[in-house]
Regions:
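Buried hydrophobic residues that stabilize the cores of well-folded domains
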Residues: 2-274
Length: 274
């Protein structure tokens, strides 16, 4: 864990990062509006989308033992289970018995494309994510089957070699009394070199509750962040930058978090070739 220092170099880097976050915040606010419009567009189509996905399915797979990761075993993010503790994809079940209790049901079409994901509770689909393919974009519409509403959106963009370039997730407000509102957005961007995955940038937007924010600030008023000490503007968007390193066999074995207070090196939580 880094220690906060207040050298001129560190202060300048902190200011630069906050300026970057403020600019990214403007982008995320525009994304909020775009994604809210996307929710409104798909909401009247949910039943048809779900029925079409189920009808097109020719094969199913099941998984369990996942924890804290989007879409379970088939999470699009190449980095979440490398850098987040307690985050795991789970495992695919080779056979199904009467005692099997899977977490997810994956539906594939005749082109072997994942077209829907059911989140299961005692074999009942409580949520269904429908995947829509448009050129290099795959949109995931996550539906609450109880009230037929959209609870999450995801967007994956791929390059011509089918490598994922970016992965976005957005949480839709559960307050049905208001117009469609996006509460949280996380955007991951990836770059590659001859070794494989090289860098990841993670941009997170969370619309903070000002009451809770003030309570937290007060509780830490004797241990202020450098941003607070410098009087920098508050920002609902945070930015993280990761560099990945590969061993001689091509596996990611460690990563570095680029930080104004000093870069931090960690061992990858699992070894994988990407």
């Amino acid at each position: 864990m880094f220690e906060i220092n207040e050298t001129p170099e560190c202060i300048e880097m902190v200011k630069e990062r906050r300026n970057k976050e403020l600019k990214l915040n403007e982008f995320m606010l525009s994304e909020k509006n775009r994604l809210a419009e996307k929710v409104d567009y798909y909401t009247p189509l949910l039943k048809n989308l779900r029925d079409l996905a189920v009808k097109s399915a020719v094969r199913k797979e099941y998984s369990n033992n996942e924890s804290g990761i989007y879409r379970g075993y088939y999470c699009p993010s190449p980095v979440d289970d490398l850098i987040i503790g307690g985050c795991r994809r789970g495992k695919l079940l080779k056979r199904i018995t009467k005692r099997t209790n899977p977490d997810r049901e994956y539906l594939f079409d005749s082109n072997n494309r994942l077209v829907a994901v059911n989140s299961l509770s005692d074999w009942k689909a409580v949520h269904t994510e429908v995947l829509i393919y448009e050129d290099n974009l795959v949109t995931g519409i996550n539906i609450d089957n109880y009230d037929n509403s959209i609870i999450k959106l995801s967007e994956c963009i791929y390059d011509s070699d089918n490598k994922i370039k970016s992965f976005l997730t957005a949480s839709v407000s559960s307050n049905k009394a208001t117009r469609t509102k996006i509460d949280e957005i996380e955007l991951e961007k990836y770059s590659y070199d001859e070794s494989g995955l090289n860098e990841a940038e993670i941009i997170s937007y969370y619309e903070s509750d000002k009451v809770i924010e003030n309570i937290i600030k007060k509780s830490f008023e004797n241990n202020l962040t450098l941003e607070a000490k410098l009087g920098l503007p508050d920002c609902d968007t945070s930015y993280e930058h990761y560099i990945f390193h590969h061993d001689n066999d091509g596996f990611i074995d460690k990563y570095v978090i680029i930080n104004p207070y000093g870069d931090e090196e960690y061992k990858a939580l699992r070894k994988v070739k990407i």
